[in-house]
Structures are given as structure tokens and as C-alpha cells.
Amino acid sequence: VKGVVVKLSEATSYLNPYAEMQVKNALVAGLKVSAYHYSHFTSKEEAREEARYFVAAAKRMNLPKSTLMVNDIEEYVTRNNINENMKAWEDEMRKLGFSNLIHYTAASWLDNNSLRILGPIETGKFGISNFWIAQYPYDTMHVTQAMSMSLHSSSAAWQFTSKGTLLTN
């Protein structure tokens, strides 16, 4: 493990009460810290508001502007005008000084995927390398199996399971 992605905020009404401790503990352990925001925005203005809320949370944690900031976009209500709203979120994040940005979503939400499903997100507007993609091809899969598949190899990251354990000494 080289780093962690800590949930800081959700919509404009939730702050992770454990985030400060999680960030501190990760830094003490020598891990790289990234942060994510769980989005609910349905308009450009809401996207900008959520970006401001996320940045305020990051500043409270003293996260540097170079921190990888993740827009977790998977709520069904966000699908209308999703591309324009995601762009508004990105623009506001950059305006506030945070430009190391990616989006987390399910493979089925992307227009470019291996599922033969046309998702609402136009990857060409953002670049496939700016997506952390969740797709679970098998109920159980080990890291070595996932690495041999090379699924989503051009994306920022591929999440191949929702279950996992960390080995300890």
C-alpha cells in the first residue's frame, strides 16, 4: 500500500467526522493522501457549490493544492447534464487552486467501456486517463489475476473489487 483516498465530503451537507484522523494517520504511516467527494449535483451551480464545499474541507485538513482530488459520481440523480456539470465542478476546483483531478465512477456510466452499454459520461471530454473506474468482472479476483487482465489500463485506476483485505505482518 502506497497511499489512501479519504472521503472528505458529500453533497454540501456532510463532512466525514473521521477524515482528519484518517489523513493524520496516513501521513504518519508515510502514505500518500488523496481525497474524494461524493457528488449529488444536478446542475452547474450545484456542481460549483459542491466543489467549494470539498475544497473548504481539504483546506481544513491542510491538504496541499497538489493533492489528488476525486469526484465520486455515481448517484443516479446526477445523470442529467452530467458532462456539463462535471466540467463545471472541474472548472471550480481549478479556480480554487486544485488541478490534480480525476473522476470515480462505474464502467457502465462511461461511453467507452467493455460492457457494450453506452453510459452518459463522454470520456472524450475529460480523457479516459482522468477516470478511476469500478468494474468487478468476477466475484473473487486476486491482484495478480487483475494485473494480467489489463482491463482499463489507460485509465487513472481500475477498482476490480469491492472486497479486500490488507495483509499484515
Model-derived segments and spans:
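Aromatic-lined carbohydrate-recognition surfaces of secreted/lumenal glycan-active proteins
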Residues: 98-112
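Extracytoplasmic/secreted cell-surface and envelope-processing proteins
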Residues: 13-17, 42-47, 77-82, 110-120, ...
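Histidine (H) residue identity feature
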Residues: 37-40, 103, 142, 152
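Residues that line or immediately flank small-molecule/substrate-binding pockets and catalytic motifs
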Residues: 8, 105, 135
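Functionally critical loop-and-helix segments that line ligand-binding/catalytic clefts
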Residues: 1, 119-169
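Substrate-binding cleft of extracellular glycoside hydrolase catalytic domains
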Residues: 2-99
